[in-house]
Amino acid sequence: MMKRVFSISWYLIIVLLIGSCDQIFNSKDNDDTKEIFDEGRINPTLEKLDGYAPVQPFWSGFDAPEDVHIGFDEFVYVTDANGLHLLDRGDLSPRITISLDGATAVTQDRLLNVYVSARIDTIIESIDPTITWNLPAIFKIKNMNGAGPLTYVDTLIFPFDDASLSTSAAQNARLNRNSSFNYERVKITGLSILGDNTLYVTRKGPFNEITQVAAPDNTVLEFSRIRENGVLTSKMINVRQIRTLNPAIPSLRSGIGLSAISSFVASPQRDSFTDDRSFLIAQADQNVDIPFRVLWVNAVETVDGLVFQQNSSLLAQDTTQADGFLYEPNKFIKPVDIAYTADDDSYIFVIDQELNKLFQFQTNGQEGVPPPAGAEDQTRQILVSFGEFGAGPKQFNQPSGVAYFDRVVYVADKGNNRISRFKLTSDFE
């Protein structure tokens, strides 16, 4: 459907021709002003001085959106019940849609390849040629943004692309519909990219033994590009399963019912990125009491290689500086997505689906933003986290994804079938 696009400069030309002081500057109740607000300006009646204000219009027309991501190409990628959608950041051009069954998480690497987790139907002749299996998969897609012919350059299908299940016997053992460990019950829940285009994947499922050769289902997997004859190809291979995350016992280094992952690399594109392989994860399992559901896991180079350690420093909480903290026990109920801003602010956003709330933290674990100039208390962070159940401009209904770009926060508001957008009032010029 074509959209009518009005530029602010066009409105200013019109009102200048009309004359009159009120018409030149516009009032809050003026129809022109309201329409300008609808095209992306802050509505001043909706927000106090400090906090996140809705950036309208919100984007509708989705069917239970699961995730939202702003790529290095600066396009917006959204997954929902119909598959994967591409939008420009104003949602002004026709959307591009790829139909995918069960599309959930989406990310993009620095080479502009898009990765999306979904489901795939496949027949495994060695088991039974009459059975169609519905398995978790990750599709690697090139040129969805129109830079060339759209191409599926790789498809990772599980359990076959889990290096810890390296034999056909081990793989086929997980494909049994009479077993509680049947791999059709496994889900890929999160995707994130590192500076060298390595892919992090979060997975959850029923098999969580830690003494077996096979990695537990609740884990983080790492995929890198395959090198052939010294040349990197577009194909991916599983190079690591991060087994230091306990799949069943809560701690500062656990991975129970993993729902999301975020590295510390994010758009916009630049010449170089951090080589830090640390990450943030969310644990959404509702059958386990998990005091710390969002964790920062440090990747540390040692003489024995790369090890993954808990970030105990976030337990230090100065209540004279902030009222909330990332490592506050029982802070979250069902965190389902995380976003890191990778700009000068270095904010961390967490979406809690059960609380219908967007949380915002700094990298020191403190909740809130620094006080603006002129604030009476310059030592205490200002809480800007918000949300409750509903369909209003600062309400959510089962929010499931969060992204950030150029000081705008994007939320996949699943139950309201929309992408909501927000911006700090202090960031409006």
Language model: regions and residue ranges:
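C-terminal motif of bacterial Sec signal peptides marking the signal peptidase cleavage site
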Residues: L16-S20
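Short loop/turn segments immediately following the C-termini of beta-strands
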Residues: N26-D29, D73, T79-A81, A118-D121, ...
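A short helix->beta-strand "capping" segment at the edge of beta-propeller domains
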Residues: K28-D63, R174-N176, T319-Q321, F386
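Beta-strand-rich domains and repeat architectures in extracellular enzymes and scaffolds
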Residues: V55-N82
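Surface loop/turn motifs at the tips and blade-to-blade linkers of beta-strand repeat domains
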Residues: Q56-G61, I96-L100, I157-P159, Q171-E184, ...
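Hydrophobic core register within WD40 beta-propeller blades
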Residues: V68, V106, L191, L258-F264, ...
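Conserved beta-propeller blade signature
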Residues: F75-Y77, N113-Y115, T198-V201, F273, ...
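Blade-level signature of beta-propeller repeat domains, shared across WD40, Kelch, NHL, RCC1
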Residues: F396-E429
